[in-house]
Every structure is written in structure tokens, then in C-alpha cells.
């Protein structure tokens, strides 16, 4: 589909931090909808540079240049870096909209919202559920950007016609982050438990009978899931810590996902 045909709304000038595997695909969907998307290319890896080129992103030298003409900043980064990215944007004097689309606890989202509000920056809470989706490879994709907070409908309108689906949850910042946390608590928390079950079975020498008891199809599914997880374990460690904080904040037990964080830390050492 030609870029002009995908977007049904006037274009918006967007700054993206950063074009990792997920961020680059978000940028690609936005550029396919006719929105100019810029990024900071200073000191970025060749792999990141290549993703940005593929997504059609416009390079900027620094944050000051990125924010100078932007109407919207989108933050897609590892959870541990979310606050630092927000501080960097606030320091530039930018006063537009800010889509916080990271896997972070609602408590951290609230702290970032307070920080940005002091600088007259308007936060929209976002959470991405699903894998990277590119306009050229979108058949059957269910990847969704969930949104909450004021101006959520404005953000959703940017992606009309895009393979990246959107869902506006409410006008309350924190709801999108909470959804991401409980979803990942199950999906990625279960993967960590699976990894440790297989590890313990191996240590006790009962891996083969476990395979028989569970069935080869189940074990094969586990192995496929773990193979795709290993390279992202360093990110998932931080995500599990955010989930533990999310649980703790409402009096639920954080220990499950603190342990999952430790499992992903071990996996990241063997990627």
C-alpha cells in the first residue's frame, strides 16, 4: 500500500527514541502512514543504523535537533532506560506530546509523568503487546499499541490503516502500562519458569522422562520459546523487575517475578 494511502489524518512530525527491533518497526509503520519520523543517530550501532534506514527514519545529530521540530516524541527503549530518556527530552525545552511506550510499572510511569509535567510535556501512556510488525511483513499480525491517558485518540489516529493495531483503553495514564505488566507477567514469567524447570530436570538427570511425561510436542514448544527468548533475556530481566514492582504496589506477591528476573539474568549470560 503506498504511504499516502495508509494515513487518513494530517501528518505529524515525530521523534523516535530508539529504533531497536520494536522501535524501528513502529517508526516504519508511522512513516508508511505519511508521518516524518526522526531519530538520533550519534554513536549508534551499525545494526541500529540499518534498521533506521529500512524504516525510512530521518537522522538527527542530537536530542536538541530531534525535538526542535517534533510535535510528538515516542520512547521505545529497555525499561531501565525509560526515566533517563524522559529526563533527556525534558532538558531540551521540548513542550509537545510524549508517548511513553515502554514496559514499565505504573508507579514508574507516574513518576515520569510528574517529571514531564514540570516541563509542560504532555504524556500519553502506551504499551506494545506482540512482536515487531513491518508494513511489508504484516500479514496476520496482531501486534497492538494499547493507549491510555489524554490525547490517546490522537495517537491512535496516526496509525489508521497501519498493520500496527491500536486500542484506546481509557483517559487514565497507567492503564496501558498495567495491562502490559500483567500480560508479560504471564507470557514472559511463564517462559522463565519453563527455563528453570528444564534446567532442574537436567541437573537431576530426569530430562528424558520429563519429556515422556509431558509429551514431545510440549517439550518442543518449550524449546522453541526459549530459543527466541535467549537473545532478549537482558531486556526481560528488567521487565520482570518492573512487574515485581507492579505486583508489590497493590499488595500482591512480587517474589515470582523477582525470581524470573534472576532466571533471565542467567540466560543473558549464555546468549
Enumerate the language-model features and the residues they cover:
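NAD(P)+-binding Rossmann beta1-loop-alpha1 motif at the extreme N-terminus of oxidoreductases
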Residues: 2-68
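Helical "substrate-binding/catalytic lid" subdomain
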Residues: 178-271
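Hydrophobic beta-strand scaffold residues
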Residues: 37, 59, 122-124, 166, ...
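Rossmann-fold dinucleotide-binding core
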Residues: 104-185
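Rossmann-fold NAD(P) dinucleotide-binding segment
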Residues: 63-122
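Glycine- and other small-residue-rich loops at beta-strand/loop junctions that grip anionic moieties
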Residues: 19, 75, 101-102, 148, ...
Amino acid at each position: 500500500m503506498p504511504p499516502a494511502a495508509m494515513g487518513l489524518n494530517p501528518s505529524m512530525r515525530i521523534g523516535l527514541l530508539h529504533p531497536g527491533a520494536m522501535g524501528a518497526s513502529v517508526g516504519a509503520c508511522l512513516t508508511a502512514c505519511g508521518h516524518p519520523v526522526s531519530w538520533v543517530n550519534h554513536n549508534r550501532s551499525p545494526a541500529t543504523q540499518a534498521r533506521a534506514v529500512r524504516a525510512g527514519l530521518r537522522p538527527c545529530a542530537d536530542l536538541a535537533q530531534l525535538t526542535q521540530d517534533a510535535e510528538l516524541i515516542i520512547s521505545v527503549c529497555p525499561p531501565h532506560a525509560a526515566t533517563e530518556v524522559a529526563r533527556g527530552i525534558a532538558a531540551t525545552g521540548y513542550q509537545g506530546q510524549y508517548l511513553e511506550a515502554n514496559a514499565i510499572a505504573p508507579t514508574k510511569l507516574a513518576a515520569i509523568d510528574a517529571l514531564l509535567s514540570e516541563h509542560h510535556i504532555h504524556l500519553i501512556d502506551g504499551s506494545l503487546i506482540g512482536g515487531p510488525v513491518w508494513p511489508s511483513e504484516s500479514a496476520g499480525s496482531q501486534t497492538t499499541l494499547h493507549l491510555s491517558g489524554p490525547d490517546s485518540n490522537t495517537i491512535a489516529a496516526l496509525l489508521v490503516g497501519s498493520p500496527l493495531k491500536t486500542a484506546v483503553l481509557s483517559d487514565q495514564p497507567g492503564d496501558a502500562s498495567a495491562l502490559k505488566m500483567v500480560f508479560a507477567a504471564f507470557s514472559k514469567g511463564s517462559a522463565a519458569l519453563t527455563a528453570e524447570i528444564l534446567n532442574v530436570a537436567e541437573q537431576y538427570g530426569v530430562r528424558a522422562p520429563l519429556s515422556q511425561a509431558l509429551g514431545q510436542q510440549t517439550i518442543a514448544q518449550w524449546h522453541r520459546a526459549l530459543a527466541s527468548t535467549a537473545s532478549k533475556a537482558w531486556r526481560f530481566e528488567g521487565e520482570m523487575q518492573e512487574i515485581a514492582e507492579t505486583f508489590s504496589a497493590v499488595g500482591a506477591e512480587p517474589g515470582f517475578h523477582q525470581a524470573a528476573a534472576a532466571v533471565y539474568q542467567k540466560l543473558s549470560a549464555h546468549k
